[in-house]
């Protein structure tokens, strides 16, 4: 027993005294390297090995300079060898898992509706959109989207009813007075509407407008105060010449107050047929304001634009007649 221990100590001391021949760490690296080399030859793919030199150098730095106890050396060597073997086994397991994943990727996907015979070739060549007996169900078994929508949203028969909305021309110029669908209007409104549509007869339209009782009711509808009427005695006519001034000239007039304006509606209109809303009817609205001191009036031309439907609403739906 004592002789065996002395021989073991001498062998350990010999290894410690002769570092050139080979240290226990170098031998461990050689053995672990041989084992990893065998595993790499058995495997098909390349295996990435960890840096054994760095691990061994860190282990060499951690060991003391003096020779340790043989029990401590054997225990440290066992832990180091077990660590190397576990890392090699984990690398081998990861490599086999990658090979298994590649093998499963190569296999084609199967659907329940696709038969097993020749399904892999059909799916790989044309994908899931290949039509045929092996690639998918027949076209007769697949209902079209149109049929699905017709079954889901069934058509309901609706009675087509015409709109009970008459145009303004049809509303005013209808020859058949006895029609029940068209409401009866007063003759004065018809005459006034025809005169307004005729732009050549300005004097006649002015007379009709002055004689019509619709003027009192139409002024508030058009946004004009009914109390601000033209002064009596024929002064309500539009003054030609010097009284018609441009808006920039009105700024130079002293004592101009807009709140003293007198309203006069000139029954002159112009229509445009190229508008999106149809023909637009423009009324020339003149505001007459008195100048302080001389009793003269300044006429301010303004415009109000109406579509035929809005004009019809203004005339007949606001109790103008």
Curated annotation (Swiss-Prot):
GO molecular function: clathrin binding
GO BP: any one term: intracellular transport
Origin superkingdom: Eukaryota
Region named Disordered: 1-80
Family matches, as InterPro entries: Aftin-like (IPR046359), Clathrin-bd (IPR029205)
GO cellular component terms, semicolon-separated: trans-Golgi network membrane
One Pfam family it belongs to: Clathrin_bdg
Cross-referenced PANTHER family: AFTIPHILIN A-RELATED, CLATHRIN BINDING BOX OF AFTIPHILIN CONTAINING 1
Name of the featured protein: Uncharacterized protein CLBA1
Species whose genome carries this gene: Mus musculus
Gene symbol of the encoding locus: Clba1
């Amino acid at each position: 027993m004592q002789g065996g221990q002395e021989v073991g100590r001498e062998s350990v001391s010999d290894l410690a005294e002769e570092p050139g021949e080979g240290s226990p760490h170098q031998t461990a690296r050689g053995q672990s390297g041989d084992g990893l080399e065998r595993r790499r030859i058995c495997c098909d793919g390349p295996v990435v090995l960890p840096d054994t030199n760095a691990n061994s150098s860190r282990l060499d730095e951690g060991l003391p300079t003096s020779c340790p106890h043989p029990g401590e050396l054997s225990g440290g060597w066992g832990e180091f060898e077990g660590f190397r073997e576990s890392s090699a086994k984990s690398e081998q397991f990861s490599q086999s898992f990658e090979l298994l994943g590649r093998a499963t990727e190569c296999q084609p996907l199967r659907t329940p509706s696709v038969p097993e015979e020749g399904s892999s070739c059909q799916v790989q060549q044309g994908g899931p959109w290949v039509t045929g007996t092996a690639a998918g169900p027949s076209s007769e078994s697949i209902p079209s989207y149109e049929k699905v929508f017709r079954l889901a949203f069934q058509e309901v028969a609706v009675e087509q009813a015409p709109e009970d909305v008459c145009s303004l021309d049809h509303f005013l110029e209808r020859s058949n007075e006895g029609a029940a669908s068209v409401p009866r209007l007063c003759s004065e409104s018809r005459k006034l509407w025809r005169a307004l549509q005729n732009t050549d007869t300005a004097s006649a339209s002015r007379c009709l407008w002055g004689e019509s009782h619709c003027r009192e009711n139409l002024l508030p509808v058009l946004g004009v105060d009914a109390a601000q009427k033209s002064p009596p005695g024929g002064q309500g006519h539009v003054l030609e010449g010097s009284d018609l001034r441009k808006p920039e000239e009105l700024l130079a007039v002293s004592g101009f107050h807009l709140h003293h304006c007198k309203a006069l509606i000139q029954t002159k209109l112009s229509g445009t047929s190229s508008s999106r809303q149809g023909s637009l009817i423009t009324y020339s609205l003149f505001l007459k304001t008195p100048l302080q001191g001389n009793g003269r009036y300044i006429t301010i031309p303004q415009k109000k634009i109406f579509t035929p439907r809005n004009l019809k609403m203004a005339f007949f739906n606001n109790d103008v007649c």
